[in-house]
């Protein structure tokens, strides 16, 4: 699976993202709209993660979707 599937079906993945990263608000999820760069940016903002940590966390989450 590639990220385009997440972006194209964002409404289906929003609940999973909210469950994994509960500090993200519904407004955050609407802004993200399935875009990986937006997701990573919001995670950095809400959790104070470094860019490398965010990328690893998103990669780990993404692999669970396959």
Curated annotation (Swiss-Prot):
User: Entry's Pfam families?
Assistant: CsbD
InterPro entries in the record, alphabetically? Answer: CsbD, UPF0337_stress_rsp, YjbJ, YjbJ_sf
Kindly list the residue ranges recorded as spanning the membrane. none
* Top-level taxon: Bacteria
Q: Which Gene3D superfamilies match?
A: YjbJ (1.10.1470.10)
Please report which protein family the annotation says this sequence is part of: Belongs to the UPF0337 (CsbD) family.
Q: What protein does this entry describe? A: UPF0337 protein RPA4217
């Amino acid at each position: 699976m590639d990220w385009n599937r997440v972006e194209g079906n964002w409404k289906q993945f929003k609940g999973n993202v909210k469950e994994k990263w509960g500090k993200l608000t519904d407004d955050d999820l609407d802004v993200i709209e399935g875009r990986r760069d937006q997701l990573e940016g919001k995670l950095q903002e809400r959790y104070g993660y470094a860019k490398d940590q965010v990328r690893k966390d998103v990669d780990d989450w993404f692999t669970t979707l396959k």
